[in-house]
Amino acid sequence: MEKNCYELQYPRDNLYLSCYVNESLNYRYHWHPAEYEFQIVLCGKQEFCRGKENFVMEEDDIVLVEPNAGHASFSTTLNTRTLVIRFSALAFKPFLKKGESFSFSGFPSGQKTRKGPRYTRIRFYAARLLDAASQASPYAPLAARGSAQLLLDP
């Protein structure tokens, strides 16, 4: 699968984003020192490990991984695809005391919550962000930034 990775930078807001659609294949344990990561299962099913937690994610499920949290996933069905959005932890710096990190509650989604309004909204703005990032229009960066801000609204 060809992977297009879109990088967006908004230095005035300390917001740096990357987004792409990924084919979930192998188990590669890793972490991001200064980034949060959303993973949204677009199709298929995957097993996900975040720190000491292991869980199965199905279509429309969402997980958020905080900075420095080790994580990995692998597909349990053929053609599993995920939308991955990574964004800088620095974006929250003005709202935190020294040494604190921003914490989002309620992740991962699951069978009972994945279709709820919160997760539907996250999927909508994530899709809008990817769509805007992939456009060549001069207004696309504005649309992407607006979608990112709405996506990150806790």
Stretch-by-stretch model annotation:
Residues 1-58, 101-103:
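Generic protein-terminus/edge-of-domain signal
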Residues 2-17, 70-135, 153-154:
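A hydrophobic/aromatic-rich effector-binding and dimerization subdomain
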Residues 37-40, 121-128, 147:
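Amphipathic, well-ordered alpha-helical segments in soluble domains
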Residues 39, 63, 83:
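Conserved GNAT-family N-acetyltransferase fold
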Residues 57-70:
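Conserved metal-binding segment of the jelly-roll/cupin
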Residues 133-150:
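All-alpha amphipathic helical-bundle segments outside canonical DNA-binding/catalytic cores
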